[in-house]
Design a protein with these regions (language model features):
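Conserved ATP-binding/catalytic segment of the ANL
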Residues: 78, 85-145, 162
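Gly/Ser/Thr-rich phosphate-binding loop
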Residues: 1-63, 76, 167
Length: 244
């Protein structure tokens, strides 16, 4: 059956596919496992417009699940951390593919680069021993727990989003407790015919099942259902600053 699914997907894209390149947002681990099962040739890249646009990539045969490949040859990528393999830090890059600054905006340009000319991406990450890059989240969205642990809401959201009937989520900090705002998959609810009582039980089910997969310091205290999809940027990133 896995081969049949694989062949169906390849044929849907014309029958001749080298590899699928994913980017723009973290890939759900369960989806990655499914891709592996059906032997779909895929990889994940990382970059930004200021890097025209690629900073890290690995071909599907070398790609390590959960990573976004290794720095491209034309760029030097570093982690602003005393221990880039174990302590998360900002991802910074320098190279011929990096922009020189923002047009007619010297203040933004000055803020975007370090004194030694590295672009501050605003993303947080780690390297493994083989040089693969792992994105942990955005520096602006990081939450500091009451006991001093760094919590990356994107990682918590990936777990929440893997739960049945969850379409998307945003994790926020309220009085040092994590609250997951969840928009449910309306089509899945209709297809499975859930009644009102079953829908009312979903928030607690989502919380319990998510917390089983999360470390103690990033446990979710509450799940709240929202009525509308989250507002997005033109790049389809959630405008998380709108949600508290």
């Amino acid at each position: 059956i896995f081969k049949k699914i694989h062949d169906g997907l390849i044929n849907a894209f014309g029958g001749e596919v080298g590899e699928f390149i994913l980017g723009g947002a973290p890939v759900n681990p369960d989806i990655e496992k499914w891709f592996k099962k059906i032997k779909l040739p895929y990889t994940v890249g990382y970059g930004m417009t200021e890097a025209t646009p690629l900073l890290a990539y690995a071909g599907s045969s070398e790609y390590v699940a959960g990573s976004c490949g290794k720095p491209v040859d034309c760029a030097v990528v570093r982690i602003d951390s005393d221990d880039p393999q174990h302590i998360v830090g900002e991802i910074q890059a320098k190279g011929d593919n990096i922009c020189l600054g923002y047009y007619k905006n010297p203040e933004a340009s000055a803020d975007a680069f370090t004194e030694d000319g590295f672009l501050r991406t605003g993303d947080l990450g780690l390297f493994d021993a083989d040089g693969n890059l792992y994105i942990k989240g955005r520096s602006k969205s990081m939450i500091l727990s009451a006991n001093g642990q760094n919590i990356y809401p994107e990682e918590v959201e990936a777990v929440v989003n893997s739960q049945p009937y969850v379409q998307e989520s945003v994790v926020v900090d309220r009085a040092s407790k994590l609250v997951a705002l969840v928009y449910l998959d309306q089509e899945a609810l209709r297809k499975d015919g859930l009644d009102q009582e079953e829908v009312s039980d979903l928030p607690e089910r989502i919380r319990i099942n998510s917390d089983r997969q999360l470390p103690n310091y990033s446990q979710i205290a509450k799940v709240e259902i929202v009525d509308q999809p989250f507002e997005k940027t033109p790049k389809m990133s959630i405008k998380r600053f709108l949600y508290k």
